[in-house]
């Protein structure tokens, strides 16, 4: 395999990363791997080597130093200088604002094309990750992003594969937290369209981003393999218990409740997205994919429109679907909040549980009395240390 040669890992004057100088971009999309790092001198090279070992032929490695006070930045710079032109295109950026999300967004702003994968500086990427993920995307031309499962490694050496199902709904993600930082590859334009990472969050950032991605682009490709070595260390951001991060968790759930309760609306460009194979487009989109059968089930009649534009019937169908999806997400989040409140109580943080139920419950429209009973049962089960409550909640949400 031949690798492109590039002159420097220094960003351009516009703050963008340097691009490949060869002519393959039209045929092989670039995947930018964005890694935020702060004071990870002892593990960062291991992570970089795992990205360099990718079998995919067009990788751009973007490392964003987030104010390291040790020699992390110099180690990254030395590694990039030593490997320039050998493995992947590299770019080293700085983000003075604290927080991994600020660093991730800095990296995203530097990307001009292709796909993006995010990774953490203390983990190891599987060598065939990008090859398999892009292959899955090629099989589903209407999908803008692809999901897979990941493998977690605990301090005692035990391993656990994270939950994952093909093509999860936004409601399923609210209960299962399927979308995690290292589990997806997405079009850069899609990530920008949903607003990138929320820099106000201190935990569960991928949980919140995953929900926005699934609402904006519900059609996902699926890769059935299990990837990576994701190390769960004692200083993990989630801590030893949920209640240690209660304030941050409540903040995330409040944000999600606000998003769920937003009244669905469909400006012209959104209708284009829904009907044009799920891809983000402008109001002046070419609607030839629609004429080829790329519209929602039951909307075939719109192909007869004189100008190829979506019809009123299409708009009504989409609006009805969105309303049903909103109700499903509301129920899923309602149940998830009760499960987490039960976990808070199991940890002896009853006042925190009550505060969560009050803060988030007030933002969600009331569910049916039967759903309320189920939520109370899940709360009681979780407060006694019961595990796997989300699986029953997911089943109940589907049945409703």
Where are these regions (language model features)?
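Helix-capping and short linker residues that terminate individual alpha-solenoid repeat units
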Residues: 56, 261, 365-367
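Flexible helix-coil transition and linker loops at the boundaries of alpha-helical arrays
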Residues: 260-270, 320-328
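Catalytic core of nucleotide-sugar-dependent glycosyltransferases
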Residues: 172, 225-234, 239-266, 290-292, ...
């Amino acid at each position: 395999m031949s690798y492109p040669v590039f002159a420097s890992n220094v960003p351009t004057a516009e703050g963008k990363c340097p691009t490949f100088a060869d002519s393959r971009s039209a045929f092989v999309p670039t995947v930018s791997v964005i890694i935020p790092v702060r004071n990870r001198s002892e593990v960062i090279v291991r992570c970089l080597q795992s990205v360099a070992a990718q079998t995919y032929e067009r990788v751009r490695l973007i490392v964003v130093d987030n104010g390291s006070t040790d020699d992390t930045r110099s180690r990254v710079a030395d590694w990039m200088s030593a490997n320039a032109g050998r493995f992947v295109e590299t770019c080293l950026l700085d983000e003075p604002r604290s927080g991994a999300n600020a660093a991730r967004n800095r990296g995203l702003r530097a990307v001009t094309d292709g796909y993006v994968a995010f990774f953490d500086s203390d983990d190891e990427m599987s060598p065939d990750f990008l090859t398999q993920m892009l292959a899955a995307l090629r099989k589903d031309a209407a999908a803008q992003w692809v999901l897979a499962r990941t493998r977690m490694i605990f301090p005692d050496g035990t391993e656990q594969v994270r939950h994952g199902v093909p093509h999860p709904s936004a409601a399923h993600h609210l209960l299962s937290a399927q979308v995690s930082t290292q589990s997806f590859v997405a079009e850069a334009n899609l990530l920008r369209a949903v607003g990138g990472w929320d820099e106000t969050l201190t935990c569960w950032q991928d949980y919140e981003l995953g929900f926005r991605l699934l609402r904006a682009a519900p059609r996902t490709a699926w890769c059935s393999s299990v990837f990576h070595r994701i190390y769960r260390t004692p200083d993990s951001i989630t801590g030893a218990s949920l209640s240690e991060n209660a304030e941050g968790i409540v903040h995330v759930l409040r944000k999600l409740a606000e998003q769920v309760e937003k009244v669905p609306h469909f400006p012209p460009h959104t209708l284009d997205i829904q009907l044009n194979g799920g891809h983000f487009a402008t109001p002046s989109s070419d609607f030839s994919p629609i004429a080829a059968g790329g519209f929602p089930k039951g909307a075939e009649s719109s192909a007869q429109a004189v100008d190829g534009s979506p019809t009123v019937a299409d708009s009504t169908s989409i609006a009805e679907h969105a309303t049903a999806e909103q109700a499903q997400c509301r129920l899923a989040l309602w149940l998830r909040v009760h499960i987490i409140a039960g976990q808070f109580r199991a940890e002896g943080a009853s006042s925190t549980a009550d505060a969560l139920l009050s803060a988030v419950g007030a933002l969600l429209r009331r569910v049916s009395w039967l759903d309320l009973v189920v939520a109370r049962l899940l709360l009681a089960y979780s407060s006694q240390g019961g595990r796997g409550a989300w699986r029953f909640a997911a089943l109940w949400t589907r049945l409703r």
